[in-house]
Amino acid sequence: MRITRDGRRLFVSMNMAGKVVMFNTSDPAKPKLIKVLDLGKDSGPHYLALTKDEKRLVITDYFLNEDDQGKVHAEGDHKIHVAKVSKNDLVLDTKFNLDFNVALGDGPARPHGVAFK
């Protein structure tokens, strides 16, 4: 979950649904849904980070869902997604495509967090 510095926009990852939701939180007592961004089949958005200028939302797509015996039922698509953020919209940036299933050449990596310099 991430919120803008002014507190007017809230972003929530819906892990098992494969979606990121954007709310208008200008009135925190009555948040309004702005956008539901569907990341597609087998996605599992987990960690969200806003760039410093708050124009992009970086989404790590790895959410591990295990049962009591350790069997994995869902773990996301191992990608990093970037969405363009505006006042009233959240749009996937199709120019950005970092797929950790193939990026390292020896199998899937599991992106978990994000750090900006």
PLM feature segments, named:
Residues 36-41, 95-99, 105:
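Surface loop/turn motifs at the tips and blade-to-blade linkers of beta-strand repeat domains
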Residues 60-80:
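Short, conserved, GDST-rich strand-edge loop motifs in beta-rich repeat architectures
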